[in-house]
Amino acid sequence: MKYIHKYLPVDKSAKILDVGAGTGRYSVQLAEEGYDVTAVELVKYNLGILKKKNSAVKAYQGNAMKLSRFQDKEFDLILIFGPMYHLYSKEDKVKALTEAKRVLKDEGVILVAYCMNEYSVLTYGFKQNHILECMENGKIDEKFRVQPEEADLYDYVRLEDIDSYNDAAEMERIQIISADGPSDYMRPVLNAMDEKTFQTFIEYHLSTCERLELVGAGSHTVDIIRKRDNKKHE
């Protein structure tokens, strides 16, 4: 939530759109803080759980690539914290970004989460000893890039992929962070920590999550973007 709050307007009348809201982990909390929050979720089951929470969130079923319910330049802040995991082509990812851009106010900000390629290769490929099998069946190519299909549920990207989506959608980066840092590599160690040591780890993560040399190595990144000022690029 630290980076959501960093880019939220102080004015509680600010309008937030949570695309791929799931069961409302972020949208419900933001609504409880007094913000005007709208949630879009593709999966009916998740949407049902969200609505049962009886929050002030306005929740609808919908697709990240088609936000036709909403007007142009309607929202101050947009969260896309799930859809990019499950969109498998560059075209679809760019379409989701372009739709979010359309409903974003000119001075607004979008936070977009991605699953990262290297985490998948290192953990499932090497740690769990599937690397040779995956390379033989084409799930991981000769450049160690994951090649998922829809049946695999998740898509994985590298930083250069994220850059290409932003370029295609004419968005520019404010900053990019590692959402998890090294934590998903060391869950048993974290679970065994005493509270003081764990809090020190959290402090470490927050102090390093913006370091570019670490961003692509974690399991997830959050890209924080805004509309590109094309005058700067002329």
Go through each PLM region and give its residues.
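Class I SAM-dependent methyltransferase "Motif I" SAM/SAH-binding loop
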Residues: G20-G22
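A C-terminal cap/extension of S-adenosyl-L-methionine-dependent methyltransferases
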Residues: I174-E234
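Conserved alpha-helix/loop element of class I SAM-dependent methyltransferases that forms part
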Residues: M1-K12
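Short alpha-helix
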Residues: L153-A169, I176
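Conserved class I S-adenosyl-L-methionine
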Residues: I110-G138
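Class I SAM-dependent methyltransferase SAM/SAH-binding core
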Residues: R25-K66
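A short glycine-rich, Lys/Arg-flanked "PGG" loop and its adjoining helix->strand segment in the class I
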Residues: V94-D106
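A short acidic, Gly/Pro-enriched loop at the edge of an enzyme's catalytic core
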Residues: S68-I78
